[in-house]
Amino acid sequence: IENLPNKEWWKLDANLTGGELFHLIHELDLLCWLLGDIEAVFAQAANQAHHDTPDSRDVLQLLLRFKNGVLGSLEMGTAYRLHQWGIQIHGENGVIEVNFFTSSVTFNYLDGKIEHVDLFDEFEADLSLRESAKGTQQYNVTHAPCQLWLSRAAEIEVQSVVEHLTQGKISPLSLCLTEAIEVAEAAKQSMVTEKQISVKK
């Protein structure tokens, strides 16, 4: 847990950015893509460690109800001593674990079979993510080099968009365009009202 040296940085202004929930929108976006539309959310948040930036909410918890009946939870923030970064999906036939620290996905089947796959098709990109995940993510650092894993992820996204536009291929990026933002907006409302909020479509 580190206090940020530049408290005037625009990204710390929740009125401009929406706050931590919108900074970490990618995991919520991934849940929408993997599990389907979310119909309701209950959320709570607090500033546990970054008291020098009082508008910051460094711990956020969301309870999610999906339209298909699935229940989910999402916890995120920057005030944790023991960092975790991953996703678990529990289903009828086993458990899928995405671990961003190890850059891997593990499939645990009911019959005891276990399969592991890397997140990237390139060893160097997986290694880059593993190394990057060990430390504090640095932002607003002038001339800081982009991590290889992040560059590769951006390249994959761009290639997907190009193929969608030039070849008509269905892109995962086009399937959930605004869902995560809509859920995040509902979560913000829930934090204020302390009530479950239906997600507007």
Listing of model-derived features with the role each one plays in the protein:
Residues 189-201:
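C-terminal capping/lid region of NAD(P)-dependent oxidoreductase domains
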Residues 178-191:
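C-terminal hydrophobic helical "lid"/dimerization subdomain
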Residues 27-31, 155-162, 184:
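A general structural signal for well-ordered alpha-helical segments in protein cores
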Residues 66, 93-175:
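C-terminal glycine/acidic-rich active-site capping loop/insertion
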Residues 1-53, 194:
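Predominantly a Rossmann-like dinucleotide-binding segment in NAD(P)-dependent oxidoreductases
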Residues 73-76, 98-100:
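Beta-strand scaffold of nucleotide-dependent catalytic cores
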Residues 57, 62-69, 89-91:
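Active-site beta-strand termini and strand-to-loop segments that position acidic
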Residues 25, 75-83:
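Glycine-rich phosphate/pyrophosphate-binding beta-alpha loops
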